[in-house]
Design a protein with these regions (language model features):
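PLD/PLD-like phosphodiesterase catalytic module centered on the HKD motif
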Residues: 1-102
Length: 102
């Protein structure tokens, strides 16, 4: 699936947006898309954390080359980092905290 999270940074000023747009060329002219900023600090932090988990992936992770090739990321000596499992753990921990509060 295509990410619909946009993060723009300028020094300490970070802006986060969510969007329905995936910017696939086949969709640009045939759809109405919406993008909106995230103002809530906690939601913004959570979205950035989620994005960073994805960047760390090195198990079955793919990179898109400048030649539009869909290549596996080489892990080398790095410890395996399974982004989907880490994402599950991330939100499971948040759920436990929320459950304790309630």
């Amino acid at each position: 699936e295509h990410s619909r999270l946009f993060i723009f940074c300028n020094n300490d000023d970070t802006e986060v947006f969510i969007s329905s747009a995936d910017f696939m060329t086949r969709n640009i002219d045939a759809r109405v898309e919406v993008t909106c900023p995230i103002y809530d600090i906690e939601i913004k932090k959570d979205l950035i954390e989620t994005f960073e988990i994805g960047w760390k992936a090195n198990v079955k992770a793919r990179l898109h080359s400048d030649k539009f090739e869909n290549l596996y990321r080489k892990r080398g000596e790095e410890k395996p980092f399974r982004a989907q499992q880490e994402m599950y753990n991330h939100y499971q921990n948040k759920l436990e905290v929320i459950t304790e509060i309630l």
